[in-house]
A protein has these predicted regions:
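Conserved active-site-proximal phosphate/metal-binding subdomains
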Residues: 1-5, 10-158
Length: 158
């Protein structure tokens, strides 16, 4: 039996419970932990992401040359309007590093420009409404998933 770890839009206990119910042995949580107090992301990036929804994201190759979902901004728009300017990986990635716009992926914590820097974001971004310590995120996730899975037994037994 091959263990499966679920990923994608897992931001709370509902996603964890669903993944476990489908047979996953665990989950990979991305965007939710960018929105934690310990994350090495600039506070302006976190604040900007708090205001975002799925409609504010786009899958783009403009930062690395490979597809990545990010919060839309002016840099992405310039590249998406001129896709021939997007280089293949690793050239686009190297250009992004040279331009110093790797944002939260690069661990930028001093200065960030939300109109230029990369703000990676999963589809669950609109469901994140606070910035919490990682321990609280995990505790909340486990508590909510446990409650959901316990209550789901009632559906089967009734």
């Amino acid at each position: 039996k091959i263990p499966v770890v679920a990923a994608g839009s897992i931001i709370d206990g509902r996603g964890l419970a669903a993944a476990l119910a489908f047979g996953a042995v665990g989950v990979w949580v991305g965007t939710r932990f960018i929105m934690s107090t310990e994350a090495h992301a600039h506070q302006d990036a976190k604040d900007h992401m708090l205001d975002a929804s799925i409609e504010d994201t786009i899958i783009t190759r403009s930062y690395t040359g490979k597809p990545c979902r990010c919060i839309q901004n002016e840099r992405i728009k310039r590249f998406e309007d001129n896709p021939d300017q997007i280089q293949k990986f690793p050239l686009q990635y190297m250009q992004t590093i040279q331009d110093d716009v790797f944002g939260t992926i690069g661990g930028k914590i001093k200065e960030i420009n939300v109109n230029e820097d990369c703000l990676p974001s999963g589809q669950g971004i609109g469901g994140i409404n606070d910035i919490l310590p990682s321990k609280q995120i995990v505790d909340n996730m486990i508590s909510q998933a446990s409650s959901i899975l316990t209550n789901s037994n009632n559906f089967i037994s009734n």
